[in-house]
Swiss-Prot record:
Keyword vocabulary terms for this entry: Aminoacyl-tRNA synthetase, ATP-binding, Cytoplasm, Ligase, Magnesium, Metal-binding, Nucleotide-binding, Protein biosynthesis
Pfam families on file: tRNA-synt_2, tRNA_anti-codon
Top class in the EC scheme: ligase
Listed PROSITE patterns: AA_TRNA_LIGASE_II
Subunit structure, as described in the record: Homodimer.
Protein's UniProt name: Lysine--tRNA ligase
Binding residues for Mg(2+) 1: E402, E409
Similarity field: Belongs to the class-II aminoacyl-tRNA synthetase family.
Catalytic activity: tRNA(Lys) + L-lysine + ATP = L-lysyl-tRNA(Lys) + AMP + diphosphate
Keyword Nucleus: no
UniProt source species: Fusobacterium nucleatum subsp. nucleatum (strain ATCC 25586 / DSM 15643 / BCRC 10681 / CIP 101130 / JCM 8532 / KCTC 2640 / LMG 13131 / VPI 4355)
Amino acid sequence: MEKYFDRLEKEPLIAERWKKIEELESYGIKPFGKKYDKQIMIGDILKHKPEENLKFKTAGRIMSLRGKGKVYFAHIEDQSGKIQIYIKKDELGEEQFDHIVKMLNVGDIIGLEGELFITHTEELTLRVKSIALLTKNVRSLPEKYHGLTDVEIRYRKRYVDLIMNPEVRETFIKRTKIIKAIRKYLDDRGFLEVETPIMHPILGGAAAKPFITHHNTLNIDLFLRIAPELYLKKLIVGGFERVYDLNRNFRNEGISTRHNPEFTMVELYQAHADFNDMMDLCEGIISSVCQEINGTTDIEYDGVQLSLKNFNRVHMVDMIKEVTGVDFWKEMTFEEAKKLAKEHHVEVADHMNSVGHIINEFFEQKCEEKVIQPTFVYGHPVEISPLAKRNEDNPNFTDRFELFINKREYANAFTELNDPADQRGRFEAQVEEAMRGNEEATPEIDESFVEALEYGLPPTGGMGIGIDRLVMLLTGAPSIRDVILFPQMKPRD
């Protein structure tokens, strides 16, 4: 504790608060008090009227404070709302007024009992009959309109952001409601929520760079999961027919307004279904959740009007042809495709060695930014879809889709590959691609998954939906950091 107080010379405002704390203690008042019997939330008090003649016992943080002499006004706030309070010495009593009220600061947490009345400015107000100091604020809150404007500080000190900005609290309340609504939608349709490992012995389930950790006792490296896919499909092999896992994934990649290395996804699998069923399920989830949260499926995001129902469906090759004029339905060699890429200024990485890779680059570099209304883009090339089933009519492509809304991907799904020989061949191709320098390719064959497929995976549809991006969409948040309570930040200098 001595080290704590040694720093007060450099922080005079905090030192001043501690002097108040010493004075409070001299009056026998504990500055960091015990449990208070809060009987009602402020938001519920606001539903009542003065003529009901009710007495309320509540608690909250002081957000504004003004007064002198024998009368003080303040606003206190809790999670549910804010209300004005009126404190008069003659009504409260001299001891509580002099020893508590005069020692208050903005940011203090107080408990109080009082009755409602309407001020001459027609504001519903609590007339305080008794008061208790619950927690003395030591560090001053920022000024309401000039203080917490630096977004970096808002993200680093989310607790202050939540105190100062009720709209931020509302975003995270909505996030919880969105997740709850997704769970209910799936539960109501017979899906079982399950838990799968966060630490994986073999990398797999998605194309991404992993975080690596080490288990000392077993003396093995483990990967923080990039996706729960392979474990969930093993559960389908085991006899569960509808499962989902709503949890964290980790990808050791860049940080941006759309990417956080730790993020939340719901991943689900349904036996005796295919990617068409997943399209219907995906649209149903997003439309119903949007309706429940916002009261409509028509929303505005980033200045764009969006309708979250009746999603479009288009094959990747058809969209590329529409946007660029290049027709990848025609048979061509890798060299011919590479020449087309050069002509259209599409970059091709060194590890890419197939027409399928180039088709995907055409889409990502030329088409993604043009998709505004909700659109299922389907028919991804086999080379970039190692876990998806080949299309029966054209085995160069898969029964896979990604959902794009306003230039961003929100979901990824496919008819699951259940042929163990084909799956092993795809894994082998991934290993070769990793050796050519693709850090996102799977560098090792998951033999346990191939073995699981040998027991028999029924025809299955699977899908993953990014929760953070969906929350951004449904709350209008411009950055993923606005919907993650404690986002990853760069170290301070």
